């Protein structure tokens, strides 16, 4: 009985271990497949390549040009070429990004007419909408009416009434009664208190400055007198 129970327990443990290993292998293989699919996603790659430092014969000799184009037609039948002779570059346009990637991997730094081909992906042209999505957007203008007033005021807004200006009429009355060189009685005297009188006088500093630095008077330029010789000649002619 004990042997049978031990044997059955060992068999159950082995079955559990094998099932756990199978689940782990399935999880690992599933993750690897997902990672490979992400790695093989070539939709973001450009469909054009640039061949740099191309031999001059490709631009001048038709046979060399056809040989050069034949290297890339193996990957895509609809491939087109744009030759830039002054820069010694050729733009190769494929119909699919997969073909461009294969050509880049297999033909980069391969020899052609005694020189190594340098193949580089062309820059992907990003549209305006996609470019805007790649940056952070400004916050939504929910409560920006204090920064710049809207066309219509917000709900519950009321215009505040301006307060009346504070005017000291007593001060204005006292200033209006003042005159040049006259005295002004602030408080009238009583039997027990003297009166308060203000006398306007010139400051001593202004008088000292006037004596030290007198103002210069501009003398008017005198009109020049007519020469006597010219007057005598005129008198002789008149006589």
Swiss-Prot record:
Give the disulfide map: none
Q: Which GO terms describe its molecular function?
A: nucleic acid binding; phosphatase binding; troponin I binding
Q: Where is this region: Calcineurin-binding?
A: 183-203
Q: Where is this region: Disordered?
A: 1-25, 202-239
Q: Which Gene3D superfamilies match?
A: 3.30.70.330
Q: Superkingdom of this entry's organism? A: Eukaryota
Q: Which family does it belong to?
A: Belongs to the RCAN family.
SUPFAM superfamilies in the record: RNA-binding domain, RBD
Q: Which GO terms describe its biological process?
A: calcium-mediated signaling
Tell me what this protein is called: Calcipressin-3
Kindly name one Pfam family recorded for this protein.
Calcipressin
């Amino acid at each position: 009985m004990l042997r049978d129970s031990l044997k059955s327990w060992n068999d159950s443990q082995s079955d559990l271990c094998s099932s756990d290993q199978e689940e782990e292998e399935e999880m690992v293989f599933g993750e690897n497949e997902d990672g490979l699919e992400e790695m093989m996603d070539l939709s973001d790659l450009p469909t054009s390549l640039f061949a740099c430092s191309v031999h001059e014969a490709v631009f001048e000799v038709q046979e060399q040009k056809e040989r050069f184009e034949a290297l890339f037609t193996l990957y895509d039948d609809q491939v087109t070429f744009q030759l830039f002779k002054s820069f010694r570059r050729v733009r190769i346009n494929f119909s699919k990004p997969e073909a461009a990637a294969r050509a880049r991997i297999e033909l980069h730094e391969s020899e052609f007419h005694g020189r190594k081909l340098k193949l580089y992906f062309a820059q992907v042209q990003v549209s305006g909408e996609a470019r805007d999505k790649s940056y952070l957007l400004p916050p939504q203008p929910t409560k920006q009416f204090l920064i710049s007033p809207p066309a219509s005021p917000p709900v519950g807004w009321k215009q505040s009434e301006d307060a009346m200006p504070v005017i000291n009429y007593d001060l204005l009355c006292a200033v209006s009664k003042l005159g040049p060189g006259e005295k002004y009685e602030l408080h009238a005297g009583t039997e027990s208190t003297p009166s308060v009188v203000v006398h306007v006088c010139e400051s001593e500093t202004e008088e000292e400055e006037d004596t030290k630095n007198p103002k210069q008077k501009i003398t008017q330029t005198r009109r020049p007198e007519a020469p006597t010789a010219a007057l005598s000649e005129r008198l002789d002619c008149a006589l």
